[in-house]
Design a protein with these regions (language model features):
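Membrane-embedded catalytic scaffold of the fatty acid hydroxylase/desaturase
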Residues: 2-169
């Protein structure tokens, strides 16, 4: 993901600056580059999670998109590798939305993208690991392996959650 962001910005800078005289940073609604690094990473993580949640809702709600996402839900037994089982078209949906969100917040450095991506992948593996681990009272706030088992159940409750890292979503 870090390479994608870095490459996207370079191509965008070359194209937009040469053709239109526009810099990538001019799309930013706010510029968080001057914020402390920990707060930039936190914003990036929450923003990425929101984009994934939004895309995940679309994948479940629309039949044409569900046809792609059902590959992920077709796993017979949960395990950490289930996190990486998905149709390639899901990336086509996720990545542009995530890149747009990053541009609107003034962009992030590739190193930050790597840190957030690594954290998200680690959490995703944990949530798909088929272990009985909840976070006590925080289980109502953060997605966890037990909650995610319900999400992958064959018969879902009416009020199913689409959350990726946060249970409240």
């Amino acid at each position: 993901f870090a390479i994608v962001i870095s490459g996207f910005y370079k191509v965008f800078q070359l194209f937009s600056l040469d053709v239109f005289g526009i810099e990538a940073t001019s799309f930013a609604i706010i510029d968080i580059n001057q914020w402390p690094m920990w707060s930039q990473l936190l914003v990036f993580f929450v923003l990425s999670d929101f984009v994934q949640w939004f895309t995940h809702v679309l994948l479940h709600r629309f039949d044409v998109l569900w046809r792609f996402h059902k590959v992920h839900h077709s796993v017979k037994e949960m395990g950490f590798a289930a996190h990486l089982r998905y149709h390639w078209m899901e990336n086509v949906l996720y990545k542009p939305l995530k890149l747009l969100a990053v541009m609107l917040l003034g962009g992030f450095e590739p190193e930050q993208a790597f840190i957030v991506h690594f954290a998200a992948i680690s959490i995703g593996h944990l949530n798909h690991a088929n272990i009985k681990l909840s976070y006590g009272p925080l289980k109502y706030v953060f997605n966890n392996p037990v909650m995610h088992l319900y999400h992958h159940a064959y018969s879902l409750p009416k009020e199913k959650s689409y959350g990726v890292n946060f249970g409240i979503s």
